[in-house]
């Protein structure tokens, strides 16, 4: 990981201005209602469930969520099916942060998670195969200009809580709140240390 956040692609390319983000969203809101746009929150839950099913660390899941949000910050929800983009982001994040999740495990996990946890929204089988995910990965990498480094609020949060001297009491709750921030646009709008500081 790059040693300096202020010189990283995360800061230089992916801390977005709120007005620019809203302007990009207006394209979608011409065709989708605000409620339909909440699908972004729903799919962060899908990514979380998929990562948990694969037993990935929370940082890998958070990275996948950031990749997902970056893609849909620049492209419409109609450009690529979020059902395909969610496991693609998990796959790419696992490669970047953890080590490759096998093709069969990823497809089996996506099928299982959609069938068991989200069957109310997806009554059919998971329609994609690994070749679709690998093709989608190219689109994702192209959009992000291969800038895969993501800084997270976890490390600064840990430092802030340690400085306060109340680790046992504060850290579990603060960690869960950080996880919940990934359902919002905060990871696109603010540096991670600011998110951690606000939570602390």
What residue ranges belong to the model's regions?
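Structured all-alpha helical bundle cores of eukaryotic regulatory proteins
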Residues: 35-198
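A eukaryotic "domain-start" boundary segment
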Residues: 1-59
């Amino acid at each position: 990981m790059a040693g300096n956040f202020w010189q990283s692609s995360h800061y230089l390319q992916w801390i977005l201005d709120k007005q620019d983000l809203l302007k990009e969203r207006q394209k979608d809101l011409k065709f989708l209602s605000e409620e339909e746009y909440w699908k972004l929150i729903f799919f962060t839950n899908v990514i979380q469930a998929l990562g948990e099913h694969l037993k990935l660390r929370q940082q890998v899941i958070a990275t996948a969520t950031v990749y997902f949000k970056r893609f849909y910050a620049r492209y419409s929800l109609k450009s690529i099916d979020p059902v395909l983009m969610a496991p693609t982001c998990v796959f790419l994040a696992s490669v970047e942060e953890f080590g490759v999740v096998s093709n069969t495990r990823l497809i089996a996990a996506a099928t299982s998670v959609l069938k068991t946890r989200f069957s109310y929204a997806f009554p059919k089988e998971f329609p994609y195969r690994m070749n679709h995910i690998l093709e989608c990965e190219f689109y994702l990498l192209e959009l992000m200009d291969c800038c895969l480094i993501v800084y997270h609020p976890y490390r600064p949060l840990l430092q802030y809580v340690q400085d306060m001297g109340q680790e046992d009491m504060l850290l579990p709750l603060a960690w869960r709140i950080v996880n919940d921030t990934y359902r919002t646009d905060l990871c696109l709008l603010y540096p991670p240390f600011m998110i951690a500081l606000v939570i602390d």
